[in-house]
Amino acid sequence: AFKNLMPLLGMGGETEKGIALPILPWWNAVAINDVPAQSDFYSSANGRLLNDLVRDAREPEKVALLQKVWRQRLSYRLVRSAEESKIALSSVAETRASLPFISDELATLISQQGLESALNQPLARILEQVQLALDNAQEKPDVIYLTGGSARSPLIKKALAEQLPGIPIA
């Protein structure tokens, strides 16, 4: 959601004076599992900040879309759309992520390559945790069980297969 969808809502933009817009409001908008981040995003102080950002942005119409997410409490739907795109990318090379609940024509194409790029850092953290577990256990597992959304992710399966060759992934 953050890397592929938030630029549609003005993330990475600048003010009229050429100053980069702060990233935190966009990050907090999609951090749906982080209660403090969501509290901050939906706070009245953030609402005032979003008003200021819309006023000062070089592309105010994009930032106004983030403001709509704030006003209508659309974070979960936004992240759900990203999740649906991620699921689709487990079986196709490219998918269209549409956000009609924000704006009728708001959409972007997301590719497996784009997803891979967006997941590089989180995937590296997952693999670090796997290595830590292996180091602590001092032995390799007989089988790897993936659950939840990760069970469908070819990226995670591939990375684990490279880290633990010869161990079946279920």
Residues of each region from the PLM?
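Phosphate-binding glycine-rich/basic clefts of nucleotide- and phosphate-handling proteins
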Residues: 1-101
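Short glycine-rich phosphate-binding loop at a beta-alpha junction
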Residues: 16-20, 29, 133, 137-149
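Localized chelating/binding microdomains
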Residues: 31, 52, 124, 128, ...
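Adenine-nucleotide phosphate-binding core of ATP-dependent small-molecule kinases
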Residues: 67-75, 104-134
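Phosphate/ATP-binding catalytic cores across multiple sugar-kinase/actin-like superfamilies
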Residues: 81, 85-88, 117-144, 156-159
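Generic beta-strand/beta-sheet core signal
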Residues: 92, 100, 147-149, 170
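Flexible loop/turn segments at secondary-structure boundaries
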Residues: 105, 149-155
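Conserved phosphate-binding/catalytic loops in two-lobed NTP-binding clefts
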Residues: 157-170
